[in-house]
Curated annotation (Swiss-Prot):
Assembly mode: Heterodimer with srp72. Srp68-srp72 heterodimer formation is stabilized by the presence of 7SL RNA. Component of a fungal signal recognition particle (SRP) complex that consists of a 7SL RNA molecule (scR1) and at least six protein subunits: srp72, srp68, srp54, sec65, srp21 and srp14.
Sequence segments annotated as region (Disordered): 566-597
Entry's Gene Ontology molecular function annotations: 7S RNA binding; endoplasmic reticulum signal peptide binding; signal recognition particle binding
Known role: Component of the signal recognition particle (SRP) complex, a ribonucleoprotein complex that mediates the cotranslational targeting of secretory and membrane proteins to the endoplasmic reticulum (ER). The SRP complex interacts with the signal sequence in nascent secretory and membrane proteins and directs them to the membrane of the ER. The SRP complex targets the ribosome-nascent chain complex to the SRP receptor (SR), which is anchored in the ER, where SR compaction and GTPase rearrangement drive cotranslational protein translocation into the ER.
Family the entry assigns: Belongs to the SRP68 family.
Major site of localization recorded for this protein: cytoplasm
Xref: InterPro entries: SRP68, SRP68_N_sf
One GO CC term on file: cytosol
Source organism of this protein record: Schizosaccharomyces pombe (strain 972 / ATCC 24843) (Fission yeast)
Coiled coil: none
Organism lineage string: Eukaryota, Fungi, Dikarya, Ascomycota, Taphrinomycotina
Keywords assigned: Cytoplasm, Nucleus, Ribonucleoprotein, RNA-binding, Signal recognition particle
Domain of life (superkingdom): Eukaryota
Name of the featured protein: Signal recognition particle subunit srp68
Amino acid sequence: MDPHVKLSTSLVIIAFRYLPNNFNDSRLGCDNLSTVGLCLKNGTGEVLFSGLIKQMANFYIFPLLLEARSDHFYEGNEYIKYLSHRIHGLRKSLHITQRGGKPKSSVDKRYAEILLFNADRAFQQFVFLRSSQRRHALRRLKRADQFGKELVSFTNAFDCNDHIFYLEAIAFAKYIEGTLNYEKRDWEGSLSAFSISRLSFLVLQNKIDTLAEHEKSVLGELQNQIDSNLRYVAQRTGLQNQTKSLDILMLSSIPKDEEVIQHVNSVDSEILQMTGDEQDSLQTITVIEWRDQRVKIEHPDVVLALYAIHDVKNSPGTIDSKRDRLLAAWARAEEITKSVLDNTGLEDEQKFQTLSICYTYLAYNVVLLRIQRDLAVENDSELVASQAQLRSRQSLYDSIIKNIEIAKELPGIARDTGMTAQLEAQISLAKSKRCQAIADAYQAQDKLASLAMCVRAASYLQQVNDILRNFEEKPHLIAFDIIPELKKDEKELKKKILLLQSLASMGNINQPPKNLSLVETLDSYQTLAELEPSWNLTDADIRAIPAKPLFFDLAITYLGQQTSFDKKKAQPEKPVTSVSKEPKQKNKGFFSSLLGR
């Protein structure tokens, strides 16, 4: 398509987004935005972007909200200021700026954007002030709830037949209402509001392909938060709601006369039908099968953890988007079961045995999910064949080996010889793959080192064969499907070893002759041609060890340690003794000397 035509069509899409609902133009042959794409043609009569315009007409609120939250990467007060600027700009464009504190409204569809941003701004202020100023934060949350209800009323009055527009508004407004009831400890009201919000999100899930990837991630986080809040509120409302799946809990908490039911029936009526198969599947959530053992879990905390795993598995979204949440749910269930098991005495042996089997089952699945997540991340990696990719593969296999070692130490596996043998085979296969990754890294630099690592990898594969030779069970898929991987690695490794052996031998042939040292050539006869270069006395593989000659030892024995033979020994200085001098007699006078004599 001509890029000018594409650009002009995009401008037409943007322009028609802000047309009023009663817009009519005979040249286009349409009466609202949802049918513009079907009539937009070029000079030859070809329809341009009909599907794209129709998809943009489906969603109105979600793209605005997700764009504001994700495109600009604002946080805290910056995002609140951004919403204030957006609200002020919309009011100026609609000529409804407030003067004197009197609010004004409009019948234009863009007025829904003002209500949406006002509600989101008040809600973000609640989140920002929640920990420091709770009373003020609750006032902002009530204000957000008021704007949300006004948004729902506006969408219903604007076009009661636009079901997607209404469901977008009710999903956002009921989420705020559920949060308000949650803060007020009104569990019944919070359960009903969160259920309506979740139902609206599930209906809109079929249309989510029209959003961008980053918008899908933001919307997925909002849905996950609704699911976790709904499960917690169900736990606080009573035991009758704790053992229900989120779908059954959601449908049982919504009154039949709710207006949202009519809109849901108009868009997707099948979502309101609960089949018997799902009812039966709920009975198997608390039944665990592990290594020919089947137990039923009855402890309430462990049961709730198992239902949380079931909720994440059945939540909307792809497997890749749910992988981290599923791993967190399994880890949480393992932690709860471990705590309950530690507090359980050995008096009730049956209960202790049941919890031990449950703990082994959960811990093993946590290890399994970690390995699968690491493998999926490595497969999705965009690194080209380089040293960085080889290092990443080596760290991946190190992580797999550590996780399998953790699984081997679990109480229910350490005494199971069959499961231990499978884990040992998986460890040996992972070590073989790690050696192959190291060999690939050394192949360009050192062929012999690469060949040595390949030989070691082959020895690990031989260990796998030895383990599986007497193994009668069908191996489980833990990190690898071990039998196909073993056959493939053996075939590739043989080719690689032959290639490296040939490359190493060619390198030895092309290598220049080594200049041997004198010690290395003493026991061989060399021709004159071989002796043309000077003898190498230093670069020898056999190094001389410095030692004192024998006559030095004899001389030291008879003469003592001599530092210098041409100099006389220095005479030791005698200690100086102090000699006391007699004091001189004073000269006497004439008469004194005469008398003295």
